[in-house]
UniProtKB/Swiss-Prot annotation:
This is Arf-GAP with SH3 domain, ANK repeat and PH domain-containing protein 3. The lineage of its organism: Eukaryota, Metazoa, Chordata, Craniata, Vertebrata. Residues 735-750 have a biased composition (Polar residues). InterPro entries: AH/BAR_dom_sf (IPR027267), Ankyrin_rpt (IPR002110), Ankyrin_rpt-contain_sf (IPR036770), ARFGAP/RecO (IPR037278), ArfGAP_dom (IPR001164), ArfGAP_dom_sf (IPR038508), ASAP (IPR043593), ASAP3_ArfGap (IPR047006). Keywords: ANK repeat, Coiled coil, Cytoplasm, Metal-binding, Repeat, Zinc, Zinc-finger. Transmembrane segments: none annotated.
Length: 904
């Protein structure tokens, strides 16, 4: 594009062309620049027109929304004014005055804003409208068209003259002759150029200075708006300052009233709760006390059902398999196709029943680890199963809330499923029987059922809520009745308890004016006390944290001293001093694992759950998991894995705990770590700990006994309870206790399993043998005899039907000190002592019986003389103590002389 020509240059060139013929040539040369200037100016004007159109739309939107804002603000003012009048009618003069004055201020500001919006419309919007409409009527486009036509005429004339000159064969013409011939065309072009520049100039004035002047006027309107609004706000500012102070006082007064009302409400709720429990004691099994927002079953189907369902397999093929199912005592049992496999037992409290809306004959049972898909014969059968499952679940839930055990719940089904539950139930009962555990650890409420697993204390439901607010860093709350606890989670509760815990944590509790809440205290006082006790350790037995004392407590297995160190703020992540005051050696948890035994497992558990730093490394880079694998501490390893210790951590040598277990050939630790690393570790884990309880399992039939004996999948009862320090002999022939460690022996044909219990009222009696002649006075004798047996001994019928043994009362005597003193005895087996007047020849080894012989003396019908044992030389047939070996060979019982042992 040629260079543009300004208006001043156009005026100068045109004046020169008009004044002298010489200027014609100069103007002719600049005519293209004149045309380019006109085109550029037109393009700029068109761009400005588009921008002004956008401004016009924005101004209209502001005006419209401004009017809407003014209207909405007027509604707001009316509402505030109505609120002020309402408070005025309630004699709340301070509040009403504030609302009314702010309503007046809102009205003033709204009026100012409305005026501003109107000024925007008048000052800006109207000029824009006239400008846009004048753009269509100013004739600028016509002038531009005429200019273009004049330019074309001029070019046509010049081209025509050049052709004529070429036709006349003139080598060239002078510029003067050419200028004279095109003079008219130049004048027409100059005229239209002037007209266009005039029209374009007028448009530029309107779009530029005139519109800017309008914006300046609107600026003054805005300035006045803000100035008037500032004046209105300044006039109201002193009143607002006074109002803020009075409102603060009113708020404090109302908060005090609300606090008192809240306390009254809590006390009334507690009273109503107690009354409801007293007035409705028989609503235990109704299920109406708890509304579960799930599918509700039809109550007419009951809570028990046995039948067949089709279950979709969980394998690759996923086929429907017919399985016998039963619902009873809040559990669903699913039998396998193989009879010798125990059925699957699912507690319904942790399941959810979901009917299939698409297929009416199907329903799902969602458990914690998988979803079971069931298919019934028809829709009615499906509805019955769903209703029974939901009803049984509701019944179990209601029983759990009312503290009732599910009758027969753990006795129905297979022994394999019931043993962990039996152990947990016994341990829970033992925890509740510990000193102080019959009352809440914090408020003293009766029958607490909520356990802090990391502290080993029992609390009521109100205090447990505050414990949950503290977080798991301070207290990990679980229910003894609602949650499925494992034995390891009761470890600290069995070894600490409320009494011992409060001896440390409430040692400095004031006796007068004590802040300790009661069972009737509100939640605020409970919260303040529990925070002071568990977070601040305000009432604990204070002493200076001493790492040496902590080391001594761990080595001496003193759990309460470790608890006292915890109360004093001892950092368990601090390196403990070495023995005899040497340089710092290892961490507290590492030391506890290294010296761990059955008696010190509670200390390890306490350190793990209360800041034991599971990922902390010792000087050699080993974590606590490495240390447990290094020393083969299987139970410590289980506690660490339960506490989510990092399995993949490596030490300075680049070894994981699994590598160490493999190198040390600790097979059990290796298997456990492999399961943890693969993510297949199942909780809870069995702990080989001296729980202090023993169990004797009976059998309902001989077939069940044989199955238990030969089934490799079922661990023997003694293997599960091998850590119990008190051996209990066969309860059929009175209970005889033998001290010493229990030995685990395999079941064999020569050692039948224990016999069923026939008299549960008999208790353990520890006796001491009387001194007798010879060198047999040091043999232990543990015998007991019920009064009924003594009374009925003279009766022939009683001698043939009842099974008794005579044991003299007394304590335990010491074992033989040398082999020359008597017969050799195996570990954990004590033999009967000599009665007064019995010679050494009358003492015999315990007799082992095969399973066939055991059944023989049950049936009866053969005499003792037919057996091989009867052919042994006996001095006397009466009052001879005979030993009976238990099923695993580790326990014996003493049989009465009246018992006729029949042997094939």
């Amino acid at each position: 594009m040629p260079e543009q020509l300004s208006v001043a240059e156009f005026l100068a060139v045109t004046a020169e062309d008009l004044s002298s013929p010489a200027g014609a040539a100069a103007f002719a040369a600049k005519m293209p620049r004149c045309r380019g200037a006109a085109l550029a100016r037109e393009e700029a004007l068109e761009g400005d027109q588009a921008i002004l159109q956008r401004i016009k739309k924005a101004v209209r939107a502001i005006h419209s929304s401004g009017l809407g804002h003014v209207e909405t603000e007027e509604h707001y003012r009316e509402a505030v004014e109505a609120l002020g009048n309402s408070h005025l009618s309630q004699n709340s003069h301070e509040l009403s005055t504030g609302f009314l004055n702010l309503a007046v201020f809102t009205r003033e500001v709204a009026a100012l804003f409305k005026n501003l919006v109107q000024n925007l419309n008048n000052i800006v919007s109207f000029p824009l409208d006239s400008l846009m409409k004048g753009h269509l009527r100013d004739g600028r486009h016509d002038s531009k068209k005429h200019l273009e036509k004049a330019w074309k005429d001029y070019e046509s004339k010049v081209a025509k003259l050049e052709k004529e000159r070429d036709r006349a064969r003139f080598p060239g013409g002078s510029h003067g002759v050419m200028s004279q011939d095109t003079q008219r065309e130049r004048r027409v072009f100059q005229l239209h150029m002037c007209e266009y520049l005039v029209k374009a100039g007028e448009s530029q004035v309107k779009q530029g200075p005139d519109f800017l002047q309008s914006l300046i006027k609107f600026f003054h309107a805005q300035h006045n708006f803000f100035q008037d609004g500032w004046k209105a706000a300044q006039s109201l500012s002193p009143f607002i300052d006074k109002l803020a102070a009075s409102v603060h006082g009113l708020r404090q007064a109302q908060e005090e009233e609300l606090h008192k009302l809240t306390q009254l409400r809590d006390s009334l709720r507690g009273m109503l709760h107690l009354e409801s429990r007293e007035d409705h004691p028989n609503r235990k099994n109704s299920g109406g006390g708890y509304s579960i927002h799930q599918h509700q079953g039809n109550k007419q189907f009951g809570t028990e059902k046995v039948g067949f369902l089709y279950k979709k397999s969980d394998g690759i093929r996923r086929v429907w398999q017919k399985r016998k199912c039963g619902v009873k005592y809040g559990c669903l049992t699913i039998s396998h196709s193989m009879i010798n496999r125990p059925p699957v037992k699912l507690p319904l409290l942790t399941c959810q029943v979901r009917p299939n809306p698409e297929e009416k004959r199907c329903f799902d049972l969602v458990t914690h680890n998988r979803t079971y898909h069931f298919h019934a014969e028809d829709e009615q059968e499906c509805e019955a199963w769903v209703s029974v499952l939901q009803n049984s679940k509701d019944e179990a839930l209601s029983n759990a809330f009312h503290g009732e055990p599910s009758g027969g719940q753990w006795s129905w089904g297979t022994r394999l499923d019931t043993e962990p539950h039996d152990l947990t139930n016994m341990l829970v009962a033992e925890v509740k029987s510990r000193p102080g555990n019959d009352r809440c650890c914090d408020c003293g409420a009766a029958d607490p059922t909520w356990l802090s697993t990391n502290l080993g204390v029992l609390t009521c439901i109100q205090c447990s809520g505050v414990h949950r607010e503290l977080g798991v860093r301070f207290s990990r709350i679980q229910s003894l009745t609602l949650d499925l606890l494992g034995p390891s989670e009761l470890l600290l509760a069995l070894n600490i308890g409320n009494s011992h815990f409060n001896e440390v944590m409430e040692a400095h509790l004031p006796s007068h004016g004590s802040p300790k809440p009661s069972a009737e205290s509100d939640m605020s006082s409970r919260r303040n006390y529990i925070v002071a006790k568990y977070v601040e350790h305000k009432f604990a037995r204070h002493s200076t944290p001493d790492p040496q004392k902590l080391r001594t407590a761990i080595c001496s297995r003193d759990l309460l001293s470790v608890l006292e160190a915890f109360a004093n703020g001892q950092d368990f992540g601090q390196l403990l001093p070495g023995p005899d005051g040497q340089a710092p050696g290892e961490l507290a948890l590492h030391l506890a694992i290294r010296v761990a035994s059955h008696a010190s497992l509670p200390i390890v558990d306490f350190l793990i759950q209360n800041g034991g730093h599971l990922d902390a490394k010792a000087a050699d880079g080993n974590t606590a998991l490495h240390c447990a694998a290094l020393h083969g501490q299987l139970d410590c390893l289980k506690l660490l894995l339960r506490g989510r210790a990092p399995v993949g951590a490596v030490n300075d040598a680049g070894e994981t705990a699994l590598d160490i277990a493999r190198n040390r050939q600790h097979k059990e630790c290796e298997e456990l770590l492999e399961q943890a690393q693969a993510g297949t570790l199942a909780f809870p884990l069995h702990m080989d700990y001296h729980w202090g309880h023993s169990m004797e399992h009976g059998f309902d039939s001989e077939e069940e006994e044989e199955e238990e004996k030969h089934c490799p999948s079922k661990p023997p009862a003694q293997a599960c309870w091998g850590s119990v320090r008190l051996d209990i002999s066969n309860k059929t022939y009175e209970t005889v206790a033998t001290p010493g460690p229990a030995t685990t022996q395999s079941q064999s044909e020569d050692s039948p399993p224990p016999l069923p219990i026939k008299n549960s009222s008999r208790t353990i009696v520890l006796g001491r043998a009387g001194h007798c002649s010879g060198d047999r006075s040091d043999l232990p004798s543990l015998r007991s005899e019920s009064p009924e047996a003594l009374e009925n001994r003279s009766s022939p019928a009683s001698s043939s039907s009842s099974l008794t043994s005579s044991v003299e009362p007394g304590g335990l005597s010491q074992a033989p000190s040398s082999p020359e003193e008597g017969l050799q005895e195996s570990a954990s087996i004590s033999r009967p002592g000599l009665a007064s007047g019995t010679t050494s020849a009358e003492v015999y080894l315990p007799v082992k019986f095969s399973s066939e012989s055991t059944r023989s003396y049950r049936r009866g019908g053969r005499s003792l003389e037919d057996s091989p044992s009867a052919r042994q030389p006996l001095c006397s047939r009466r009052h001879i103590p005979v030993g009976l070996v238990e099923g695993d060979g580790s326990k014996i019982g003493v049989l009465p002389d009246s018992l006729q042992l029949l042997h094939d």
